[in-house]
Amino acid sequence: MRLLLTIFLAFSIPENDCSTFYLIRHAEKIRTNKSDRDPKLNEKGILRALNWKNYFIDKDISKIYSTNYNRTLETVKPIQKAIGLNTILYSPSSIDYKDFISSNKGEIVLVVGHSNTIPNFVNELINDQVYTQIDDLNNSNLYIVNMCDSNISHNLIEVN
């Protein structure tokens, strides 16, 4: 009888179909060499990366995505180390958003990108053109997208 009850419960408990996506731009970068296409974080950026770690430490992040640039990888590194996850690299120019959504169903995901890619990423997730490019000096935007079945909610907050 217990075995039947266990089997029944295993098949009757719905799988969590809700997903949460946190999307941020990389922290402040070194700007002394305008021709450097892959700068590292400056001192303020290193501090912001630590602040992001403190923000995300209790969010139960299950996957971390980052572009393959020094500034994004350095932004995510303290978070990655604190929660013990590997970073999954992605390219904004080649991402299939429908596949991204389906492969992260039921997950709590952090995505780190750039001022000119994160707003579009959010727009693709929510299937609407709500957000515009981030000002180049703004590194504090946090976009939150929640998806439960066909219900999608989104929010933009500033985290300093």
Task: Spell out what each predicted region is.
Residues 1-20:
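Bacterial Sec-dependent N-terminal signal peptides
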Residues 2-4, 37, 105:
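A residue-level detector for conformationally permissive "hinge/kink" positions
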